């Protein structure tokens, strides 16, 4: 696993061995960023100086990729101490630990964001364990608790056969399938 582009392009990321984590594949992450940067007609945001939230962070690859590409800050949420430890190790390895906030939280039961999270965020990524029914409650909590900025882009990774429902404040911009993975791009507009 590596950073795909930006100032840390090609740098390897640590991943726990023997873990049940399912990190987003490099090629899928690269495709996601190609869509974000070149394929969304109705999103007017930017990665430059963005505040990002990576929910169900795992290794932190998505948030770290955004920092490599110009984001100002990334908040990583996971309920696993091992996931947060590997994310911290990766951020330290890249020399960007000052640009991150690590929060050990259950994403389905979020409270309002702490000041360190630099919320509301203009870009969010949710990659819950597949088929566990965690994505929709986490998405609803991000909205309800004020984690998302108006016009935020929310990228949701789910199993290809899963369906995603969301409130009327979200609109689907794009949907892509990569083998067993479906990626849904949503715009949040209050």
Regions found by a protein language model. Give the residues of each.
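Class I S-adenosyl-L-methionine-dependent methyltransferase catalytic core
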Residues: 1-190
């Amino acid at each position: 696993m590596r950073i795909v582009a930006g100032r840390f392009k090609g740098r390897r990321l640590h991943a726990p061995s023997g873990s049940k984590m399912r990190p987003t594949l490099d090629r899928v992450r690269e495709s996601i960023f190609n869509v974000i940067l070149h394929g969304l007609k109705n999103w007017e945001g930017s990665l430059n100086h963005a505040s990002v939230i990576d929910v169900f962070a795992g290794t932190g690859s998505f948030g770290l990729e955004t920092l490599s590409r110009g984001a100002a800050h990334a908040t990583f949420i996971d309920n696993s101490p091992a996931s947060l430890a590997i994310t911290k190790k990766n951020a330290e390895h890249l020399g960007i630990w000052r640009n991150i906030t690590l929060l050990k939280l259950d994403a389905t039961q979020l409270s309002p964001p702490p000041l360190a999270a630099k919320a509301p965020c203009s870009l969010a990524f949710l990659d819950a364990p597949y088929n566990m029914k965690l994505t929709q409650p986490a998405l609803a909590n991000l909205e309800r608790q004020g984690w998302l900025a108006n016009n935020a882009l929310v990228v949701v990774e789910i199993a290809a056969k899963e369906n995603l429902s969301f409130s009327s404040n979200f609109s689907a911009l794009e949907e892509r399938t990569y083998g067993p993975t479906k990626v849904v791009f949503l715009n949040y507009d209050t």
